[in-house]
A protein has these predicted regions:
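Conserved C-terminal C-lobe helix
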Residues: 119-133
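Conserved HRD-motif arginine in the catalytic loop of eukaryotic-like protein kinases
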Residues: 140
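Conserved activation segment of eukaryotic-like protein kinases, specifically the C-terminal portion
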Residues: 38-51
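Protein kinase catalytic-loop region centered on the HRD/HxD motif
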Residues: 1-4
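Activation segment
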Residues: 54-59
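Conserved catalytic-loop aspartate of Hanks-type protein kinases
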Residues: 62
Length: 174
């Protein structure tokens, strides 16, 4: 819906329809976008820094939260600083610009990428997630449409790599 800020995007609020479409649920704390929205509401682990600080925020706060969901999914269901017990301490570490959560440094240690396609897809997804999760709202995607465009490019590149792999496997069998 246009001009609606969900304010609590997290994995528990994302459902999959019978046809395989992702749907955002639980609009209990959503509200129409009003200039200078400042209410602190949502889940700390997926909350944008400006929301946590009680500063004015807009739709880019939801983009940040979606970026955190993508990070969580790509990082084997772990958030930045998951070893820290307190969600408030975790958000403070993210906001302080601690580079330890820069997942590009962790790509090789995840053990997820077992082939070139996976390595490449992680690198492509990295830029999208880090843009969505920028601490500065002006450095983030300014619309869901812009983020969707980059995610579609990412998917296209991953599918292209998969097709090349399939062609390579077929050629090796000949």
């Amino acid at each position: 819906a246009k001009n609606i800020i969900h304010r609590d995007i997290k994995p528990a609020n994302i459902m999959v329809s019978p046809k395989g479409y992702f749907k955002l649920g639980d609009f209990g704390v959503a509200r129409q976008q009003i200039s200078g929205t400042m209410t602190v509401i949502g889940s700390y682990d997926f909350m944008a820094p400006e929301v946590y600080k009680g500063m004015p925020y807009d739709q880019t706060a939801d983009i940040y939260s979606l970026g955190m969901v993508l990070y969580y999914l790509a990082n084997d269901f772990k958030l930045p600083f998951s070893e820290i017990q307190s969600s408030i301490d975790r958000i403070n570490r993210r906001m302080n610009g601690d580079t330890e959560w820069d997942w590009k440094q962790k790509l090789s240690s995840w053990g997820i990428a077992t082939n070139i396609k996976q390595k490449m897809s992680e690198e492509i997804l990295y830029d999208t997630v880090m843009t969505a999760c920028a601490n500065d709202p002006k450095a983030r995607y300014q619309s869901a449409t812009a983020m969707k465009r980059d995610l579609m490019i990412c998917m296209d590149k991953i599918c292209t790599l998969e097709k090349r792999k399939d062609n390579w496997e077929a050629a090796k069998k000949k």
